[in-house]
Amino acid sequence: GMGLVPLFSRWGTRTDMFDATQGLNGSDSIGAIMALGRMAMGVVFFLILMVATHKVTTFKKLKLTPAIALGGLMIGMSLACYVTSTLMTTVANAVMFIYTGPVICVLLARIFRKEPMSPLQWVCLCIVFVGMLFGESLLGFGVGGNAFGLDFNLAPSTPEFPQKMVGDIFGLLSGVFYGASMFFNGYRKDADTTARGVYNFIFAVIGAGTVAILMNVVGMATGQTNWITEIHFTAFNWVGAVLLWIVCGPIALGCLLVAGRNLPAMDYSTIAYWEVPVALFIGLVVFSEPVTLNTAIGIILIVGGGAFPTIKAMIQGSKMEKQQKVAEHLSERLEEEAAKEEER
């Protein structure tokens, strides 16, 4: 779901979905507004799910803790900052910054929760991070005009991106908030997923809305009219926007919430990079973006490095299921034996 963001965001905001030079059908704050829509749709869907599954009472009994609130607040602010960043700086920088999030999550979990992490898990995380750099053409052969180089430009301003430094700051914030959200989602594993999801998305709306409001306030105060929200969507744009809000909102972020609740931070963070190959596949199939040697290497590294925690989780799940069946069978046998003893 998260890997489909480039498809639906381009569909929902661009004047021409396949031509970035045509610009956007809105102002620079449109990214925060799109993130706000994703979170608002999440609230609607999880409220419907809560009523449909008869968990209103569970929601009322669930104690709202800082971890639940901050998990939602952080993801809302992260995605609002990320989409805004892609409009003000290079896509390479924006992607590089937000994908520091899983690494930040792992470090926070190691420091504050003392989660054990094996050398193999660290190796897998490093592999998928390097794979992300290759996949996004930030690192690799022929990058930056070199035989082998790194493309990471920290210039405060360029002719193409006059507000580049601001965009880089938004990108850095998106990574910090993303990592913090993943970290906070690892708490309160006892909380019902549906009930927690309602709270998460409510606070995510607050987070994304805060970024959108601040951009408008700063825009009006400094005279940067391009920061003041303007929307000129066509019917075609609205279809893409709604698909973004649904598929990349309650569906994708709901799965992210479930993963954070059930997986250790290291496995959670490693698997999070799998959205990169999905985005690259969308770029190839829909936008005819070429698959270079670097992107191929990136996909192989991400899939290979991410396979370990995925397979491990599947094996553990299978073992737990077998143990549960054995326990149930043993319990039935004991009950049968007890019944026979009573008959005697």
Where are these regions (language model features)?
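Hydrophobic alpha-helical transmembrane segments of multi-pass integral membrane proteins
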Residues: G1, G26-L49, C124-V130, M165-L173, ...
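Hydrophobic/small/kink-forming positions within alpha-helical transmembrane segments
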Residues: G3, L7, A40, G72, ...
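C-terminal-most transmembrane helix of multi-pass membrane proteins
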Residues: A35, M39, S137, N237-V239, ...
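C-terminal transmembrane-helix exit sites in multi-pass transporters
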Residues: G101-V123, L133, P277-A296
